[in-house]
């Protein structure tokens, strides 16, 4: 990065500054898709499904079995998982990541000390409500079963920290037609950045999900 904000002798408040807007873009990176990890053929394109009305997908099937797909969801899209052969070792990656987030990262993200056990309870509640329109009040009630002193403000603060750590990512409601008179749900779906974190939060395994 080249930086030149003016002569070093110029007072800081008088130097010309540039925020980078229009020249520097931010890019959010996600764990790998099955196509990126070479486990999906990529024969069906999401873009083509929407843009190509004549696209024919009849007869196209995945070469992966249900059991294999479950294992891959539990493993997740972590690049390190491709470097280990043992399925047991692959499953440990998401578990270790979850432990690191709860024990360390959630307090380090903004230098606010947080309770690792409460973080685990919130992640477990999210996992129970994965890809649903569950309300925060319902998830808070779930957490309060084991930690009854938790209040909504604390719950929201932890969720915000977990989103900044790219662990949680709620998905906004999708409206295909802006002018459509059809009533649609506007709530957000409760999701993780990778399904393997939800599996780890629940203490589940490929066998228990089959």
Q: Where are each of the predicted segments found?
A:
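Conserved nucleotide-sensing/catalytic segment adjacent to the nucleotide-binding pocket
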Residues: 1
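Interdomain motor-coupling "hinge/lid" segment immediately C-terminal to the ATP-binding subdomain
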Residues: 4-128, 132
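Accessory nucleic acid-recognition modules appended to NTPase machines
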Residues: 82-210
């Amino acid at each position: 990065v080249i930086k030149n904000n003016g002569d070093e002798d110029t007072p800081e408040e008088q130097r010309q500054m540039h925020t980078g807007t229009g020249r520097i873009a931010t890019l959010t990176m996600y764990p790998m898709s099955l196509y990126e990890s070479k486990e999906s053929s990529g024969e069906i394109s999401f873009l083509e499904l929407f843009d190509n009305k004549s696209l024919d997908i009849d007869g196209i099937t995945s070469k992966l079995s249900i059991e294999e797909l479950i294992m891959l969801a539990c493993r997740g899209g972590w690049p390190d998982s491709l470097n280990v052969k043992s399925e047991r070792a692959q499953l440990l990656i998401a578990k270790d990541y979850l432990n690191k987030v709860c024990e360390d990262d959630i307090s380090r993200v903004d230098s606010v000390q947080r309770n690792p056990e409460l973080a685990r309870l919130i992640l477990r509640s999210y996992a129970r409500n994965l890809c649903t329109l569950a309300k925060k009040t319902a998830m808070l009630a779930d957490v309060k079963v084991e930690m009854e002193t938790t209040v909504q403000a604390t719950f929201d603060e932890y969720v915000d920290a977990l989103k900044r750590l790219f662990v949680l990512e709620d998905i906004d409601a999708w409206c295909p037609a802006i002018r459509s008179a059809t009533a649609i749900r506007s709530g957000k779906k409760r999701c993780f950045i990778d399904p393997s974190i939800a599996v780890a939060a629940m203490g589940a395994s490929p066998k228990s999900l089959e």
